[in-house]
Each structure stands twice: as structure tokens, then as C-alpha cells.
From Swiss-Prot:
Keywords: Cell cycle, Cell division, Cell shape, Cell wall biogenesis/degradation, Cytoplasm, FAD, Flavoprotein, NADP, Oxidoreductase, Peptidoglycan synthesis. It catalyses: UDP-N-acetyl-alpha-D-muramate + NADP(+) = UDP-N-acetyl-3-O-(1-carboxyvinyl)-alpha-D-glucosamine + NADPH + H(+). The lineage of its organism: Bacteria, Bacillati, Cyanobacteriota, Cyanophyceae, Synechococcales. Residues 29-197 form the FAD-binding PCMH-type domain. This is UDP-N-acetylenolpyruvoylglucosamine reductase. The active site is at residues 176, 227, 297. GO terms for cellular component: cytosol.
Amino acid sequence: MPTLPGRLTIVKGIKPQPLVSLANFTSWRVGGPAEWFASPSSVEELQTLIAWAYEQKMPCRVIGAGSNLLINDAGLPGLSICMRKLQGSDLDPKTGIVEALAGEPIPNLSKRAAKAGLHGLEWAVGIPGTVGGATVMNAGAQGGCTADWLESVQVIDLNGEGPFELSRQELDYAYRKSLLQEKTLVVLSARFRLDPGHDYKELNQITHKNLTHRTTTQPYQLPSCGSVFRNPEPLKAGRLIEALGLKGHRIGGAEVSPIHANFIVNIGGATAADINQMINLIQQRVQMAHGVMLHPEVKRLGFEATA
């Protein structure tokens, strides 16, 4: 078992733990151990951990809901920080201003906003992620996306600089892309400006309809990461994959979902290697058949550089 390097000012509950399985912190339920793992309960604890990792010159990364991650079976070096305890949000029904910590589940925020008569996040009710992850990936569904309603984010750099604020304009948003994916920045919180004064019952009907649509057209009963590939607009990744007859195709415990071809599910006993091999196979087959390179939405950690 590794020995904790250097000196860390221990804040209650955040002493890094060695060799913690990351499979329990990803929605695919695969992945090896983190060399060091911690789950802070406050922004101050998070800052302490990031500063410690920087001082030790060790790799550092954050994990939200783990719904957009594929982690190598061999695990990850350095410090992995789980953001799930950093939850909380404030909503102003009069102005429409919503502030939420990075670990707040985006479906919870969607429901709270609807209950407060705030229109804008109904699309997010079925997104299996956190506010932080949504701002990084520009998560979206049902014709809406994070960038439509985000006003700003508060971030800290992994080199310890910050916190500081970035506006939506500074984040350079595009389809499933943002500046945050290219920088060593960790989202601490986000501010949204929603549309106030709407009827709760009407918003609730919309959120219920959106959630029903997602649960009936996507394989929610099995572990997955959500959509694996970005849509090569105006085409749909799922349709390109389905056209090749890959629905139901299996590699080990990984399967292209028979319900939605842009989902790879863990039918039991899958490894990260199985899923990674499936991703590569789909990319190769679609490229050969359609002349289109599919780019994953999912972030692969611990693997060689991939498209």
C-alpha cells in the first residue's frame, strides 16, 4: 500500500485514501483503482486537496457523477477527487438567478427550478450528471443545452490559482464542447439565468414528458455512460451505428444496446478494455461504411491518446 507523500493539512474527512476502486464512481461500473482518492465536502477542502497534489507534483483530476468517463482497468496515478459531496443550490424565483455547486445533480436542479416556476432546465431532468460536468461538456437534450442558460462559472486551476470567474462568452461553447475541456480548470460552481414567472404545473408536465421520453428510448436499466458518440451533425450517430447491424453486438460484457445504438451497456462483468475495444470497433466500422469519423462524448482516462 502506498504511503501518503509529503505533508497534507488534514481537514476532517478529506485525507486521501489509497487504492480506491473507481468502478464504484463511474456509471459504467468499470475501472481500476485510484492511487489516491478523496471526496471533499466543501470548496475549502477541495482547494486544500488540489494544492497538496500540486505541491507533490502528482496528476490530479476530478470526477463528478462519472457518467461520461471510461477509466482504464489498471487505474489512475495520482489523486482522483470525487465531487459528489459538493452539492447545494440557491434559486431566486423573482430574478431567475440560480447558483449551484459543481457536485449538484443536474436532474435535481432541473426539478427544483421547475418547482420554483423557472423555465430553462426542463431538458436536463434525465441527464445523469452533475452541474460541473454539464458545464464542461455543454450537456444537452431535447433541443436545450447548458450554454443556453449558463451565465458564468467559478473555477480553480489545478496549479492552485483562483478561484476566479469565467463568463459564458469566455467558455467558447459549441456542440458538446467548451474551453473547460482544454484547460486544467476545475468548476467549483455555476450561475444560471433562467426565465422566471412560469406555471409550475406546466413546467412539471414538460419535465415529466422529457424524462419519460428518455427512459423509454434509452437503456436506463443497465450501466452505461449515456450517449457514447457526438452526433456528426446533421447525422445521428445512433442511426449510423444501427445501419451497420451493430445493435446487440457484444465484446466481453460490453454490448451495443438493442434499444439505442449510441449506447454501450455493461450487461455484467464488462471491463474498461471491453468497452474501449467496442468504441474503437464502432469508429472503424462507421468510418469504413459511411466515411464518417465518430468522436466520443465520453472521456477516456488512462488510455493512449484517442480520437
